[in-house]
Amino acid sequence: MSENEVVGSPTTNGDKNEDGYPAENGEGTNVDDNNNEEEKDGIPLDNDNDENDSSEESATDEEAERQVREGFIVEDEEDEVPQEIRRKKKRKKHAESTADQDMLDEEDLELVMENTGQGSRFSKLRRLKRGRDQEETLENIFSEEEEEEENEVDDEAPNRTQGHRAGVIDEFADFIEQDEFEDEERQEEKYETGPPIESVRPEALGISDDDYIQIYEVFGDGTDYAFALEDEDAEDELEESVSLKTIFEPSELKDKMLTEEDEIIRITDEPERMQLYMKRNIDCSEDEFREQVAWIIDYLLKNRRDIDAELYEPFQTAVRYVVHFFIRDSLEVPFIWQHRRDYIVHNNRERNTITPLLSQNDLWNIFFLCTKFWSLHSKKQDILKLYSDLGINDDLVVPFCEAASSLDAIDDLNDYIHFTYSEQIRDRALLMGTGLRRPQGSKYSFFEKFRKSSLYNLVKEFGMSAKDFSFNVAQGARLRFVEDNTLSPEELSRTYVTNELSSPEQVLQKARRVLAEEIIHDPQFRKSFRDKLYNAGVVTVLATQKGVRKIGSEHPYYEFKYLKRKPLGSFELEPILFLKMLKAEEEGLIQLSIEFEDPDDVFKGLLELFVSDNFSENAMQWNAQRELVLKEVFKRFSALAPDAIRETLRSRYLDELGMRCRNQLFSRLDQAPYEPSTKNFDRGTIPSVLAVSNGKGESSDAIICVFVDDVGEPTDSLKLADLRDLANQAMFAEFVEKVKPDVIGVSGMSVSAHKIRQHVQDSLTSHEPVDLIMVNDEVARLYQNSTRAVDEFPTLPTISCYCVALARYVQNPLFEYAAMGRDLMSLSFDPWQHLLPPDVLWKYLETALVDISSLVGIDINEAVTNKYEANILPYIAGLGPRKADYVLKKIAATGGRIDNRSDLISKQIMSRKVFINCSSFFIIPNDEYPNMDILDSTRIHNEDYELARKMASDALELDEEDIEELETNRGVVYHLLEENETGKLDELVLEEYADQLEREFHQKKRNTLEKIRLELKDPYGEQRNVFHKLTPSEIFLMLTGENPEELQADAIVPVNVRRVTNRFVAVKLDCGIDGNIKADEVSDDFIPPPQLLQVGQTVEGVIISLDEANFMVDLSLRNSVLQSANSKRQTSSHRTSYWDTEAEKRDTERMQAETQAEQRVARVIKHPLFKDLNASQAEAYLSKMQVGDLVIRPSSKGSDHIVVTWKVAEGSYQHIDVLELEKENEFTIGQKLLVKGRFEKMTYQYSDLDELIVLHIKAIAKKIDEMCIHDKFRKGTQAETEKWLESYSEANPKRSCYAFCFDHQHPGYFILCFKASVNSPVTAWPVKVIPNAFFLQGNVYGDMTALCNGFKLLYAARTKNFRRM
């Protein structure tokens, strides 16, 4: 079935609402309206007004907890607790001990409250202190003592963290014996603290309200003595019961979908996938809805170039309808595709044509775009709220925010507000009570101070503000003009000279800096600059030192290793290439740069919008100042803009990669059961299958034959040693005659499987014809060793389970793929799918399962008892793994079956919205049950049942009396089908009927009417594509693992010699296929093959031709052919017009020189740690050794150098160059060994190798160990450390933070990452480990304490200097 297939013409169902959208939400069903109401959680009323009532106590507890959170604790509140309650609480101590196990302890609760932004519970209870200065000393900015000081608590203050729940502990409590009514009191407390008992209505008892009240006053509510009727064993069970949280780890609860969030998803009346993947606002305003539609349309049109101009308006209307279905009606993609198709096609009545507007892929794109929009929208609302709270008036903020269409633009606006109004934001934070004192200065303190000073007037005298210039850039024209000052820049700046700024140039420098910063933070400028860079940008790749060595000509990254100035826009056609480049950059193999193709031209264009047209000397001087400002802006933002572009492209291209994987899986799922050519089966009939395989194809492997019947169960099997034996062939033929399969499927895990196929065919030459096919075994390979196979067939051997999976794949590919669940991600859908995060990949794969599962439908009653069929239930529209499990359990609890679809509502198995989405995909066969509805066995939705009955009665030309009579006897539709009168449906003129429905009821139903006709003629007929038979290329790839395209002519491959004769040489390739080399292709000198080759030898050969079907290849070993193939590969490999040939040549020559240097006479040094290895070999040698181990090896720099390579950490090795002085000769070790520290500009001298090892290597290793055990060290990468700092800073906005991590690019170095405030960026300083010390910013520190303190002092000093500027 094609994804874009559209059956019939456009139509619709349901009246339009006030907004012009169809009110099609299932209200035409044959379900009782009373049963369509959503269940509401009732709140039972308890008439017991006793002061000790547990509900009152619970309310008190909740109030106490709320007060704890808010910090408003009354000192003497505990003294007001009645004495009776205290006594009861002492009695409850034993009962509460079990409940307390589920509660967080003090430290955990403290951490949770801090991380959720509620602050410490104890922070409000600290003793009063002297007021601090408004600005703390900079030395304390990263102080660890601050936290301890802030968490001090009055020693005499009672611990009130538990509120009333803690109670008062009697000092003599341990000495008081429990009285004999302890059990009774526990029972009393059980009823007090347990769930409220639902009240009984008087009318249900047949008495009046007054009588009920009188009875209640005399006898109570019946719970006072209920404990006496309680079974003690049951009570013990209750006391011993524990929550799931005490049984399972949180990760296990999440995997088993038993968390509270899972339960919410399970019971909420919304499709499960919408709750998981779609962030939306059902109650959004019409303005918000229109904004969302416009944003999605704009996004889609940027990527759709196949829409004609005349279809733009219908396309936009179709998108508007789809968004409405998602947001307002909670309809999933399969429902829209099946039952709202009329809204996503264009019906041209004049031309009588129907044009599809949206495909299933488009529907899923819109589905995910809804989430992206609401993420954008929520950020917009946050910005507008901040703007409103600040009480400022800025004509840029609101218009820019409303027009922003990307998260980048919103981030730009956020940066602009925090830069421009940083002081107001800090004042707002103070007023909101987020801190005890005025927050310290931010990174914008200098600009705040500058804007308040008179010097800011000089910035205004530049003649054009940052806003005006950015407006010109955004418009691409000079619409706002410069006004030159009558004084020259130097003359005007003299008036601002002070003691700190002693010259006009210093004054101008400060003014230029401020103006440049204002331009850089202007969101209009940022957006326009990024747009220019995207449209006129080029990409250049520079291989790192690691990349030069690692990326060889056969490496998958070589295609872009020397890429130079490739237009950025060209990657729209090669999105995967860009993703591969980003991945290579993450691995440290390349550096990716995005820059303007002609930066000078772009700069001139921007400058034209910023300068004056006047030609006076004064104007020229001011223009020169403006040019200096723009140079700084251009330089700074040229470095910042590429990051946003690459992340935007990464997100977009990952979506495209996800869609590629989805489409691949969709095509594999879209296969009907195999249709045997020798049988007259209806489409969709399940065949019986005989699966044959020899497993891995090794000589010891037997041939296994497993027969699987048409219900998917293995019923017979046969094991043969060798099918080449005629006796075994006869046994196989007898077995086939016995089980009589509809089709025989062969597969295996080696090339020998294709020979098994030939042997099977030979065995059946005298047998009546049976289809013989090769079967895709990608599912079977995973199934054979899975826990699912063990659970289903615990006694079957692995290879037999493999055969069962092969047979089932032939019977129904969908069921086999669906049964895999998330293991589907182990299959290959795209060579680069590993670039997708697992959750994102699964999200896209799931969409394919949902589409095909909903197309095929599910026999819901069969699914209750058949787990194999139930595997597709989670992928039915409206459901998911949680709701599917819930539905099966509810059906099992209500008799194990449902008689009709309406039972899903009437028996409260599912709620209304879920029912609307999934009901038509539930098949209920037309069995002989009185409550059966024959339409429940079709794809017709309940809302269209009346239309189906109307069409059936019109086809049979029945009057009302006839219809009434037939409806009392199974109905009109049943009569139409039983009497085989469905041919009369073709006589109906559906177009006229559809026009009438649209004209009178505003319902588009043309496609729906056609679908009803098809379903009445063939209920739930097979609509998938025919079973896909593997092509020779696909069989070749499956059995060899090699793509045939990679084994074409001129490919160079290693081959192993198996047989040598004077006429030919038989070889085998690594992939398992056989090769043949003619005698004249062995050498150019026509030397007989036996004189050159011997069995077992491995040589390089050139492929001449490949026979895919027979798994044979012809090769040549001639030197001339090898040289020609090498030359072709080098000239054609990855060459493009954007290739840096000079860099490639330079690196090649350097690598060759290093190779030659390594191949010189090997140097031998008498030392146990010396090895004759190169750099990569040394790393490989140390990879299996302990951290700190080392080797001494020769150096490529000459005989007066050696290299010490040592293992810094797992995967990290430092190569230390050692210069030898005072050598006796070329081969002896020098008497002086020097290690030059370039970074710290120090030279270390040693007398021999052992001294160097102990005093240098081991001393460094000891310091690295000291760093790694420090509490400020983090094991992750720099990016992970920075992310952690960001998260920590958000959770602790009043604190500065820092951490150390490995510098993976420079072994032997660490990176000090720090974040001074929540609004400041993360800054990184390099820290080098030197013998017995750490080196930071030109200073040497002996230990970690000194390093941390030194860092704080350095930062404080720099900040002070920065403020003076």
Swiss-Prot record:
Disruption phenotype: Loss of nucleosomes at actively transcribed genes. Abnormal heterochromatin formation; decreases histone H3 occupancy at the pericentromeric region. Decreases cell population growth. SUPFAM superfamilies: Nucleic acid-binding proteins, Ribonuclease H-like, RuvA domain 2-like, SH2 domain, Tex N-terminal region-like. The keyword Amino-acid biosynthesis does not apply. Residues 1167-1262 form the SH2 domain. Residues 47-64, 73-82, 102-111, 136-156 have a biased composition (Acidic residues). The modification Phosphoserine is found at residues 143, 454. The modification Phosphothreonine is found at residue 137. The keyword Ion transport does not apply. Residues 24-33 have a biased composition (Low complexity). GO terms for biological process: nucleosome organization; transcription by RNA polymerase II; transcription elongation by RNA polymerase II; transcription elongation-coupled chromatin remodeling. Its main location: nucleus. GO terms for cellular component: nucleus; pericentric heterochromatin; transcription elongation factor complex. Residues 1050-1118 form the S1 motif domain. Gene3D superfamilies: Nucleic acid-binding proteins, RuvA domain 2-like, SH2 domain, Spt6, Death-like domain, Spt6, helix-hairpin-helix domain, Tex N-terminal region-like, YqgF/RNase H-like domain. Residues 1-165, 181-202, 1124-1146 are annotated as: Disordered. GO terms for molecular function: DNA binding; H3-H4 histone complex chaperone activity; histone binding; nucleosome binding. Keywords: Chromosome, Nucleus, Phosphoprotein, SH2 domain, Transcription. InterPro entries: NA-bd_OB-fold, RNaseH-like_sf, RuvA_2-like, S1_domain, SH2_dom_sf, Spt6-like_S1, Spt6_acidic_N_dom, Spt6_death-like. It is found in: Nucleus; Chromosome. Residues 1-14, 1124-1139 have a biased composition (Polar residues). Pfam families: HHH_7, HTH_44, SH2_2, SPT6_acidic, Spt6_S1, Tex_central_region, YqgF. Histone H3-H4 chaperone that plays a role in maintenance of chromatin structure during RNA polymerase II transcription elongation thereby repressing transcription initiation from cryptic promoters. Mediates the reassembly of nucleosomes onto the promoters of at least a selected set of genes during repression; the nucleosome reassembly is essential for transcriptional repression. Belongs to the SPT6 family. PANTHER family: TRANSCRIPTION ELONGATION FACTOR SPT6. This is Transcription elongation factor spt6. It comes from Schizosaccharomyces pombe (strain 972 / ATCC 24843).
